[in-house]
């Protein structure tokens, strides 16, 4: 991440730690701050896909391409402090849903911001869909 942190992010605190503290903190200490599910997930280590994504994130951060969208299918990656400010496009099974990581997302999963299902919007029932709809056709 670039050394310049926006002023609105300086007020952010995660479990009593500022964003700067989280960025400078070793991974072992950061893991202790996470909720149990995320903590256990990270203690097991990263999968190959997660490791490749992390390498890609670090490469983009080093090059200073903060606005480049990182496309991924890895929904089970925990959002780490070094991901703040980056843009991701996470696959939801049909398309890539794009979003920017803000400090409030730390400790959550990438998949939480790419919803896989959409709200069902029922239309009018079709002809013969219900027993009463048989009589609607006769009326009209």
UniProtKB/Swiss-Prot annotation:
GO terms for cellular component: cytosolic small ribosomal subunit. GO terms for biological process: ribosomal small subunit assembly; translation. GO terms for molecular function: rRNA binding; structural constituent of ribosome. InterPro entries: Ribosomal_uS19, Ribosomal_uS19_CS, Ribosomal_uS19_euk/arc, Ribosomal_uS19_SF. Keywords: Ribonucleoprotein, Ribosomal protein, RNA-binding, rRNA-binding. Pfam families: Ribosomal_S19 (PF00203). Protein S19 forms a complex with S13 that binds strongly to the 16S ribosomal RNA. Belongs to the universal ribosomal protein uS19 family. This is Small ribosomal subunit protein uS19.
């Amino acid at each position: 991440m670039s050394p310049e942190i926006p002023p609105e992010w300086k007020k952010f605190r995660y479990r009593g730690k500022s964003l700067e503290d989280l960025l400078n903190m070793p991974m072992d200490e950061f893991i202790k701050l996470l909720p149990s599910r995320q903590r256990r997930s990270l203690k097991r280590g990263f999968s190959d896909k997660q490791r490749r994504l992390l390498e890609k994130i670090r490469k983009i951060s080093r090059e200073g391409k903060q606005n480049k969208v990182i496309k991924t299918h890895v929904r089970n990656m925990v959002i780490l402090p070094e991901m703040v400010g980056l843009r991701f496009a996470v696959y939801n099974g049909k398309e890539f849903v794009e979003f920017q990581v803000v400090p409030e997302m730390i400790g959550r999963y990438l998949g939480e911001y790419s919803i896989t299902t959409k709200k069902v919007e029922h239309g009018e029932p079709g002809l013969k869909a219900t027993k009463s709809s048989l009589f609607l056709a006769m009326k009209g």
